[in-house]
Structure formats: structure tokens, C-alpha cells
């Protein structure tokens, strides 16, 4: 099973994670982390579509290099990839189940990308956190399992692991930006204020393009101090 989660705790820096479980056990070597490349702002649906596309387009590309005659086969794409994995010819097999963290919207975005890649037969579900509802393609009503079932507990475990990895990656990138930031030398900017600025705007370059009034929307920053900060950051 492979599970995807989007983390956008920073409004200008979205990331995603993919965790893989084999026989109910984390396959840590095949975890993946993604920086969202094509989406501006917070858009979970578009971000989910991007990471699904990148993950499975790459697997298909790798499979094509070991099976160049796949286009002449009567097998489906999923059947071909699983046969190659059984023969030991594919670098990594397609999962038995794809899980996306979210409800109908995330599931629809992910399903659309799988269909465009020809992976119509690849099973996929969405697991929504609030009520632990399971959404399936083509089904309007969610599936609700008893909270004490082993199946739901396994789904929750892999979903929570994907969530943990995505958030950890976002925090790692934020710490990296803080370490490298020009704000370190800016008068009147404490470490706490720097963290808030980078979390809100993403980078020094984006802060430079904001007005003092926009920056002052952050708690604890006045228009006057924002003006002084911009003057310092934009100095020649």
C-alpha cells in the first residue's frame, strides 16, 4: 500500500509525502518526499494530483525501459507492471492499494491522474480524518468501518505515518530557510518573529515584494516596524 499526504502549514511552501507499507510493515527505504512544483498557494486537490502524477509516471517510465514492447501487449498497464515485478525485472511494483489523505476532492484529483496514466485498474481510496470515512471512486456514499476493526486501524496507521512524514519535511525546510535567512541580521527581528514571517510568506524575496501593511497583518508587527524591515531588506 502507498499513502499520500499534503502539508501546507506554510502558505507559500507546500510539500507532500508518500509512505509505503508491505505486509502491514513500513517500507522506509521506499518512502518519498516531494516539493510541490506546479501549484501556487494552498490547493490540496491540485497538489495531490501533482504528486500522484509524478509518482506513477516515474514508475511507468522505469517499467518501459525494461519492457519496451509493452505497447503491443494485450495486458493492462497494471497487469504488465505486476508481471515485471514478479519476474524481478521492475525496480518497484505498483501497490495493491493507493490511499490519499482526504475526501472526495482529493480522491477525484488522484483518480483523474491515474486514469490519464492508463492505471484504470489500480485500486484507490480516500480516507477522511474527521469521521474516518473511506471514499471510493464511483461511490457517492462513504464506507464507514467499525473503529475496532484491524482493517481501519491499518489504514489509520499508514495515513498517520504519511501525515507525520509530510509535516516533518515541511518543518525541516522551514528550519533550513530560517538558518539561511537574511532576516538574521535585520534589526528588530527576533527568532520567533523570523519564524512567523517565513511561515507566512515563504522567503525573504517574497517578503520584499509585500507592502508594510501586508506584513503588519502578522501579530506583533506594526506598520512602522514593517517599513523599517522593508527598508533594510531592500537596501542597495
Q: Where are the regions a protein language model picked out?
A:
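Acidic, glycine-enriched active-site microenvironments
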Residues: 1-236
Amino acid at each position: 500500500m502507498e499513502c499520500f499526504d499534503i502539508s501546507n502549514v506554510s502558505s507559500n511552501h507546500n510539500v507532500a509525502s508518500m509512505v509505503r507499507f508491505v505486509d502491514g510493515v513500513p517500507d522506509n527505504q521506499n518512502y518519498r518526499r516531494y516539493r510541490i512544483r506546479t501549484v501556487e498557494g494552498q490547493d490540496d486537490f491540485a497538489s495531490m494530483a501533482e504528486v500522484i502524477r509524478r509518482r506513477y509516471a516515474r514508475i511507468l517510465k522505469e517499467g518501459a525501459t525494461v519492457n519496451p514492447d509493452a505497447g503491443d501487449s494485450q495486458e493492462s498497464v497494471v497487469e504488465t507492471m505486476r508481471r515485471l515485478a514478479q519476474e524481478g525485472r521492475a525496480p518497484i511494483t505498483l501497490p495493491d492499494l493507493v490511499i490519499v489523505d482526504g475526501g472526495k476532492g482529493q480522491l477525484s484529483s488522484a483518480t483523474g491522474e491515474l486514469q490519464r496514466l492508463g492505471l484504470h485498474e489500480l485500486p484507490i481510496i480516500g480516507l477522511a480524518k474527521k469521521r474516518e470515512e473511506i471514499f471510493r471512486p464511483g461511490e457517492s456514499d462513504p464506507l464507514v468501518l467499525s473503529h475496532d476493526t484491524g482493517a481501519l486501524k491499518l489504514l489509520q496507521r499508514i495515513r498517520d505515518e504519511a501525515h507525520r512524514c509530510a509535516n516533518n519535511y515541511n518543518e525541516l525546510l522551514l528550519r533550513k530557510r530560517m538558518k539561511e535567512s537574511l532576516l538574521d541580521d535585520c534589526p528588530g527581528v527576533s527568532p520567533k518573529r523570523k519564524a512567523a514571517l517565513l511561515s507566512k510568506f515563504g522567503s525573504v524575496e517574497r517578503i520584499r515584494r509585500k507592502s508594510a501593511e501586508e506584513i503588519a497583518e502578522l501579530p506583533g508587527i506594526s506598520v512602522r516596524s514593517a517599513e523599517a524591515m522593508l527598508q533594510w531588506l531592500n537596501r542597495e
